[in-house]
Structures are given as C-alpha cells and as structure tokens.
Amino acid sequence: MSDLPAHTSIWGELADVDHELRHVDVGGVRTRVLRAGSSGPDLVLLHGTGGHLEAYARDVAGLAEDFRVTAYDMVGHGWSDLPDQPYTIDVLSDHLVGLMDVLGIGAAHLSGESLGGWVAAWTAAHRPERVDRLVLNTPGNIADKPEVMVRLRESTMAAVLDPSDEVVRRRVEFLFHHKEMVTDELVGLRRAVYSRPGFVRAITNTLVLQDPEVRKDFAWDPDWVGRITAPTLLLWTDHDPTGGLDEAALLLEWLPRARLHVIEDAGHWPQWEKPEEYLSVHRDFLLTEAQTV
C-alpha cells in the first residue's frame, strides 16, 4: 500500500513544501529553476526530450527531506530560453555546469531521466569533479536503434506542430505504462510549452540528436562511458519503450562502478508512476550506500 497520498495536482504535490521557483541567467540563457530542501547533499534532477521540471513534481517533496534539490528546464526546453542553436549533448552539459556555477554548487549528485540521463552521464565523464554519484533513469536507446530515433522524432515533432489535446496526450502517454495516470493538467502543461513562440525551432534543435550523423559524436560508447568514475545506479523499468534490459547490460559492462535496479510495472517515467520506489532507491543509493564506501 502506498505511503504517499494520491496525486491530485502538481501544486498539490508542492503545496506543503518550502521551495523557490525562479529564473536565473546562465551564460545569457534565462533558465527556470525549482529548488527545495535546506540540508543534505545537492541533488540535481534532469528531465527528458521536450520535457520540463514538472516531470519531478511527485518526487520533490520526498527528496527535499534528505537533499538540497534542484530541478530545472534545460536550455531550449520548458520555460527556459530558446536560443537558435543545436542542443547537442555538450551544449546541454555546458548549460548544466553553468547552472551549477550560478547556484554555487561545486559538486552534486545527478539524476537524469531519458535525455537528462544522457546529459548527466556525459557530464560525469567530461567534468568528473562536478559529479558525486550518478543515477541514470531510463536513459533510453543506448544501442542507437534507428526505429527508436524515428519514433521519438516523429511523435515529438507531431505534438509540437499540432499541440492539440489529442496529439499532445498521445505524446505524453508514450512515457507511461499506465496511460490512465496521464492527467489533463500534465497534458495542458505540455501544450503550453509546445505552443510557446519559437518552440518549433527549439524542438528541431533538440531533435538533431535523433539524426544519426549528429548523434554519432555523442552516442553512448565505452570509450567515454568507461571514463565515468562516479558510482552509478542504472534505474530501469520493465516497460520502457525506448530501451530494454539488454541495453542496461551494455552499460553494466562499460561502467566501472555501476549496479542495476529494475522498477516493475512502469514505463519511461518511473518517477511519476512509481514515486515511492523511486524515492526509496534514491535514498538507498545516494545516502545509505555512500556512507558504506
């Protein structure tokens, strides 16, 4: 039986949590940031392609009990600025490190979902001094399967070109194993983001990562993945449409200090579908296990 109250709304998840929502300047990019929690290690949460910080609405309160939590909208996403440039992994990683600089965070735990996991891993490999521990939450398509790239590109672009309730709902439902958990509010938020002036151009700049010619420079590869020294948790599910356990096995081979946890009965967004287990696994890995090293 769940220890968390039933989800009513995003505001309901945050109503009793001391938090701050604001924009900060990161190298000229106006960046939307939510922060909560006053003690414990820093934990930065990274959303996925076309996403926004509300992806973690069901988790902020629980995480803030033990961590100083930062969730943010990546450059070109959510309600952050949309500069006209390709949002490749190095650009997204530089934006993350720049945000940490602005917020005075020297090093932090990083937990990234989907694209956010890719960015977090790249940062851990190329800026190891900024990453304590790493959680890769359904990072997706480690094997660079063309059909997965096509599906993500086409479904995302369709929703941005036609941000109607029906089309955007279909895009959000792609993230869930339990489609009935997709709320009108969540769809409405995505519709608002996808309707922003300039967002068609922005999502085009994001989806360059689904072009094999661009992707090859940043694709998951043992050469750079093997340089990650941070202890790493691979957080998989049994119904992720972007990548199965065979891809988790690849990362277990490449990463020198990794272990796998599989959340059952969930899709690409376990942090929303299974928040209790998501929180428990994070606490165990980032707090309990860290103390035993």
Listing of model-derived features with the role each one plays in the protein:
Residues 228, 234-236:
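Short beta-strand/loop motif that positions the catalytic acidic residue
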Residues 25, 29-79:
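Conserved HGGG/HGGXW glycine-rich cap/lid loop of the alpha/beta-hydrolase fold
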Residues 256-293:
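Catalytic active-site module of serine/aspartate enzymes centered on a nucleophile-bearing elbow/loop
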Residues 214, 239-243:
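Acidic catalytic loop of the alpha/beta-hydrolase fold
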Residues 31, 147, 163-226:
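Conserved alpha/beta-hydrolase catalytic His-Asp/Glu region
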Residues 90-108:
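Conserved acidic catalytic loop of the alpha/beta-hydrolase fold
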Residues 1-43, 66-67, 105-106, 283-293:
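Alpha/beta-hydrolase fold catalytic core
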Residues 121-125, 132-168:
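Flexible "cap/lid" loop of the alpha/beta hydrolase fold
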